[in-house]
Structure formats: C-alpha cells, structure tokens
C-alpha cells in the first residue's frame, strides 16, 4: 500500500483535522443501521488548526464500542493531540469500565489531566476542551465533557443537549473559592483570570489552580426515537442553537454530508473559529 494511502487510513481512523478540510465516515459492524461521519475546517485565525477528532468503532471483550470525541485546543494544539491519542485508551484501561463506566471516565479524565500537567514542558502552556461519547453495543451512550464543545441528540426531531457548557459566569463561585476571578469586560465574554473563556479544561497549567477538569457525565439509552447525535466544537454553537443545528441536517441521510453541511451553515453565519463536527446516525 502506498504511503499516502496508509496516512489517509490513519487520518480517517484517528480523525486529525489539519489546515485543509478533513473528513471521514464509517459504520458499525454489528449494527448496520448505525453510521458516522466527521468534517473539520480551519478557521480564520493565523495559528494552525487546533481541533482533533476521534470517530471510530472498535471491538473490545466481545462488545462493540463507538468512540466519538471533539478536542478543541487553545494556545496550541499539543494538548488536544495528546487527548486524541490517549484519553479513550485511558478510559478503557480503567478496571471498572464495564461495571461503573461513569467512575472509569472520571478517573481517566483526572489521571490524563495530571499527566498533561506533568508534561507541560513538552506539551506547552495551552489546554483543550473535550466532549467524548462512548456508544456501547449500539444501545447505551455515555457522554462526558469539559469546556464548551457540545453533544446534542435528536429525538423525534427535537434537540436535546447531552453536555454542559462550562462557562466562567456559571461557575464564578467555584472559581473564586479556588482563589481565581472571572473578568467581565464590556464587549468581551467572561474569562477565568481574564484569560480563558471556559471554566473547565485539560491542561492550562498556569491557570489550573482556578480551573477544573472534572467532567459532567450523562447517560442515554438509544431507542427507536433516536435519530442522530452530533458532537461539535464551539464554532458551531456560537452561531447556531441546538434546534437550528438539528433542523439543518435532519433530512440529510449521509452522516459526513450532514457534518459538512452543518459546518458550511455555521460559516455562512460568519463563524470564524476552527470547526469540527461528528454526526452519528441511527436510521
């Protein structure tokens, strides 16, 4: 196999979003009705693309797992890249993954962040948001997140947010209790210590005393009313509501085409950020 073809397959599996538009699609081997696709586009900023994506199915101990994630880096891409490579592996290595999935996710988020902080000389001073989804045997979905990348489910055409936006204004008391402050400058969004626009993130060693990496976690059962789930970085959510996003893609059957269309819609609404989107279809 030619080197370029090998690289292409690696990129489709891992979901690296480079400076040019990147894309991928796939489907469950156990559940033929479940398909997934992703699309990524670099924003208007001068720095390199800082989004990394995971979108794949894998078999483990007789089960099939759908692994989906958006990692939206800031002040560099190294932390987001590290998460793409390591976070799911760390979750799946937890001894209680099958018996207490939520606890396994919390432990892995915590331990992964600890390693990132220990390796700050290598990984840099930046950080990353994360939204992760683990689909177990096509029936059970566990979503975890830190930051403002978001997961949204469409059921009977109605949008249901599965993640929590960790905004500094909402967590002001917690930030202040740790010795930090939330700036509120006219014309700007609230920021932790006047710097970061999210209250929870991986990395960010210089702010870590005032930041949390504790995820919010939700559990969902996939049923006949579940149409699709979308995971996306905040470049979507700055310009589209949850319901607008669902309405924009509900009639598009191919998940990659749906992800691409949603990003194009966000760009048409003047979104300037890096944008990554995963769509998982159940029909």
Swiss-Prot record:
A single MF term (Gene Ontology): protein serine/threonine phosphatase activity
Domain of life assignment: Eukaryota
Sequence ranges assigned to domain PPM-type phosphatase in this UniProt record: 35-282
Cofactor field: Mg(2+); Mn(2+)
Protein name according to UniProt: Probable protein phosphatase 2C 58
Keyword Membrane: no
Chain residues that bind Mn(2+) 1: 72-73
Hydrolase is among the record's keywords: yes
PROSITE patterns found in the cross-reference section: PPM_2
């Amino acid at each position: 196999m030619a080197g370029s073809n090998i690289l292409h397959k690696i990129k489709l599996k891992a979901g690296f979003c480079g400076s040019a538009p990147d894309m991928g699609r796939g489907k469950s081997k156990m559940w033929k009705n479940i398909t997934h696709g992703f699309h990524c586009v670099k924003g208007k900023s001068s720095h390199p693309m800082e989004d990394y994506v995971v979108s794949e199915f894998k078999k483990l101990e007789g089960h099939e797992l759908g692994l989906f994630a958006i990692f939206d880096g800031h002040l560099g891409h190294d932390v987001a890249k590290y998460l793409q490579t390591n976070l799911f592996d760390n979750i799946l290595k937890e001894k209680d993954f099958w018996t207490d999935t939520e606890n396994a996710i919390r432990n892995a988020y915590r331990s992964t962040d600890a390693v990132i902080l220990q390796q700050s000389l290598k990984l840099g001073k930046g950080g990353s948001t994360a939204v992760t989804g683990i689909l177990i045997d096509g029936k059970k979905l566990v979503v975890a997140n830190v930051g403002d990348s978001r997961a949204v489910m469409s059921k009977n055409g109605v949008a249901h947010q599965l993640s929590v936006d960790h905004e500094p204004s909402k967590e002001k008391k917690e930030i202040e209790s740790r010795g930090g402050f939330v700036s509120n400058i006219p014309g700007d969004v609230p920021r932790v210590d006047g710097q970061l626009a999210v209250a929870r993130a991986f990395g960010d060693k210089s702010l870590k005393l005032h930041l949390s990496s504790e995820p919010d976690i939700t559990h969902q059962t996939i049923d006949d009313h579940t149409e699709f789930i979308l995971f996306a970085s905040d470049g979507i959510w700055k310009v589209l509501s949850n319901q607008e996003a669902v309405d924009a893609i509900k009639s598009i059957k191919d998940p990659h085409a749906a992800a691409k269309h949603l990003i194009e819609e966000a760009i048409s609404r003047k979104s300037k950020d890096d944008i990554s989107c995963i769509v998982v279809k159940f029909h």
